[in-house]
Amino acid sequence: MEYELIVVGGGPAGLSGALKAAQNGVRVAVIDRQEELGGQLVKQTHKFFGWSRRNAGVRGIEIGRRLRDAVLAEPRITVFTGTEALGYYPDNSLLIESPSGVSRITGKTFLFATGAQERMLLFPGNDLPGVYGAGAVQTLMNVYGVRPGRSVLMVGSGNIGLIVSYQLRQAGVMVRAIVEALPQIGGYAVHASKVRRLGIPILTRHSIKEAHGREYVEGATIWELDDKFRGIPGTEKDIDVDVICLATGLTPLGDLLWQAGVSMTYVPELGGFVPIYDGNMETERSGIFVAGDAAGIEEASTAMLCGEIAGLAVAAKLGKIPRHRFEEERNVLAQELSALRSGPLSSKVRTGYERIKALVQGRRG
Amino acid sequence: MKSLYGDLPEKDSLLSSGIPSVQDLDGVLPPAEARKKGPVAVLECFQKIPCDPCGQACKFGAIKEFSDVNDLPVIDWMRCTGCGQCVAACPGLAIFVVDETYSPEECLIAMPHEFVPLPERDQVVLLYDRAGRHVGEGAVHRVVRGKDKLATPVVWVRAPKALAYVARALGLPESQGRSGN
């Protein structure tokens, strides 16, 4: 079966791209390894920021439901859930594995919206059961309705660490502390204030020293860090927890992009190795587009906009829409994107995207 | 430092602890004339992030529409009726309504509250300050649940007047949601 666009990853970026392309006449296949479309949105119970006209104030789970319903109602989109993309081949085909077996599908263009994976942290005892990534804790609680334990140490005060701490409390689980290695809280102040007034201490310049327990986590030792992020002996504190939740950042999931031979570059501000792509989200391999965390760690509002830009660019590339209409609509989306990124808290990602832009211009010039 | 807001740091505490400082809160305190006229919204929003639902939620034009989505909200307190729409709308749960005219001894505080079970009318609740310290008791005046089940409920609490700018969270006595912290 040949499709005009194959989207790998049914999260906010992939679904937004699939919809935008299909609405402009492109025949699309969406592949996702989960049974349900939506990516991380299916467990995000907090209300989104951004513009009211674009889902601000709406909870992630609801945004995911709206995207999923729209995709399933779109006749030009074929959805393959429970299906994993195993590899990309130079004849523009993709090896996929679904419950019914392994097969190949061919696409004129591709959108890799494969998301991110969580970063691990090194400390003694980090292999004990009870040490979780924040994504797993969120899945257990918000998708399956299972409490991960009774008492938690959260490591990392980015938005994920803060939001998951809040959700743990909503589920009736104690959060003993949130430790943050940096001198400042990483996430939004409103999220921090929200968990602080529930009585959860946020300890900056602190980290986990070690986890205790014979067969599973029975406690943890935290300590203060000096300016070089080394633990200060004598500042250790033992805390009574059975869960250690790591919210220590994400790194783009680029395996398929590497394998497809897309040029990659290391951009620390975007979380690690990312593909090099232009303002239309197209990589240096013509016809291969990227969006979402795979293109740089950010958040779902910007991921959805990048997905839309990619979907629109695919439609233009395939000749489905006239150039001037594409440019007009693309510029509106690009302006929204740069407005979302224009605040003081986005300075890091702005630096990252400037690096990519400079690389693209350098190669063209 | 003892202040109108209780025992809070004087400044520079927000980004290192999550606790707004006296300086932060002084910057968003409604003027005396607004506090004397009735219920009024207090926007405890101190950091420029891309977010605008409060401006959209206000039916009275008190919270100005955003020209840049990253702006901090600007409120015209004399137009604010204290209706509480913005409390439920704020994605950051950073808006409260305070009515210091409720009675000679008591004030009303409207707080976003996303915990179940929701308290019942007239139920006694425990009140906490911005650092999560227990600061007193209040009684539930009313609970506004919102249109759908995903909306943020707003709980209006009668509290001692001295807590009008101190209490910013509530819990049920012996609630499972609060045990341990």
Regions found by a protein language model. Give the residues of each.
Chain A
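Residues forming the flavin
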Residues: 1-365
